Amino acid sequence: MSITNKESPEQLNNPEFNNHYAENGNIINLKELKRKLPEELQAQAEELKIENVSSLRKQELVFAILKKSVEQGGSIVGEGVLEVLPDGFGFLRSPEVNYLAGPDDIYISPSQIRRFGLRTGDTVEGRIRAPKEGERYFALLKVNKVNFEDPSKAYHRVNFDNLTPLYPDEKLGLELEDNSKDFSTRVIELVAPMGKGQRALIVAPPRTGKTVLLQNIAHAITTNNPEVFLIVLLIDERPEEVTDMQRSVRGEVVSSTFDEPASRHVQLAEMVIEKAKRLVEHKKDVVILVDAITRLARAYNTVVPSSGKVLTGGVDANALQRPKRFFGAARNIENGGSLTIIGTALIETGSRMDEVIFEEFKGTGNSEIVLDRKIADKRIYPAIDITRSGTRKEDLLVDKIVLNKMWVLRRIIDPMGSSEAIEFLLKKLEHTKTNNEFFEMMKSPAERK
């Protein structure tokens, strides 16, 4: 790939140089353009009299619209997530196209990367210009923001690997008061409360409602914790489920469907985790919902070079190191910032490989939500096995009085079977609007007075 965009630092900070590309017409926001539907882009392209519109892919359409708009006197503001290539230069990839390389990517020169201390995963926003003669990509002219903050702050950040991890001590509010039909997030609050920095596994056999449960968790997080940056990562999923998730979740939804190669699954996961790490370095709270960790581990197993040592089920001995590093990145950070990862692990699929992957990940999380096939077969949702689900160090997330009531609840339902336990709890929750109201109902008449 030949890249010829070469701007010196002096040029890039020179007002006269920037004014040469200053807007005479409209400002075009590249991010908003990429969010448009293909039909809207086609209509816009036809207005600009671009030829062969129907034969162009979405990214090619965006590129053509930008180029034509600049010719007519417009200027462009762009944003994307940086991927630094081995040659030293980088490109801003877009979450709207799942960080896939395309003609509408924005080129960043090595001098800009060095000057601002940029790394893979940084979210960069700035003014961009159209490609000159002999160039293939739009180029970044001026950096306005790095990770939604002033670029100067990027100098003083501490590397993610040097940050001190702690147990989660601030609870993620998952309880939705207005949700009278679905009690899944209220049940999670009672049996396995989540905190900022949690590393949680949803252990799920097929057809137990794990994807719907993830959607409910995502909805609860965005409603109750607006300060949290939410990313939903779908690996090896069906395209219709991706569309459903994009339409139901207010957050960043990125996906690599089952018809894409394993290398694409891995590249997407690496971009997402690097982006999350850079945001945590800026003391932000990030939540990643992964569906599914098992399929991600399968993808790593496919792309990793063979070590010659193969475990049971066909898993290479070195294959699980990188997915473990992905999952292990979840942590609560001392002095601000946290990365929470809630991932689904598939079991009872009939694949020995999936069982081996689950066993490897079993002890790495600090919270587990176990879904039961027998409960789901009775069409009871959420199909959570209460006795087998729980969170480590939950005393740091809830106060002592509530914790004692949670323990009393566990003692009451322990003699019951898994189906009877969740049915009993759901019937009680139906009569109350909040979990606090539910705990009040648990009190004896003497305690209520």
From Swiss-Prot:
A GO biological-process term: DNA-templated transcription termination
Span list, region Disordered: 1-20
Boundaries of every Rho RNA-BD domain copy: 75-150
Binding positions (ATP): G195, K196, G197, Q198, R199, A200, R207, T208, G209, K210, T211, V212, R238
Keyword line: ATP-binding, Helicase, Hydrolase, Nucleotide-binding, RNA-binding, Transcription, Transcription regulation, Transcription termination
GO molecular function: ATP binding; ATP hydrolysis activity; ATP-dependent activity, acting on RNA; helicase activity; RNA binding
Cellular component, GO annotation: cytosol
SMART domains membership: AAA, CSP, Rho_N
Polar residues bias (residue ranges): 1-17
Gene3D superfamilies given in the database record: 1.10.720.10, Nucleic acid-binding proteins, P-loop containing nucleotide triphosphate hydrolases
Enzyme class label: hydrolase
InterPro entries assigned: AAA+_ATPase (IPR003593), ATPase_F1/V1/A1_a/bsu_nucl-bd (IPR000194), CSD (IPR011129), NA-bd_OB-fold (IPR012340), P-loop_NTPase (IPR027417), Rho-like_N (IPR011112), Rho_factor_ATP-bd (IPR041703), Rho_N_sf (IPR036269)
Tagged with keyword Nucleotide-binding: yes
EC number from the UniProt entry: 3.6.4.-
Family: Belongs to the Rho family.
Subunit details: Homohexamer. The homohexamer assembles into an open ring structure.
Function field: Facilitates transcription termination by a mechanism that involves Rho binding to the nascent RNA, activation of Rho's RNA-dependent ATPase activity, and release of the mRNA from the DNA template.
Protein name per its UniProtKB record: Transcription termination factor Rho
Naturally occurring in which organism (per UniProt): Rickettsia bellii (strain RML369-C)
Lineage, opening ranks: Bacteria, Pseudomonadati, Pseudomonadota, Alphaproteobacteria, Rickettsiales
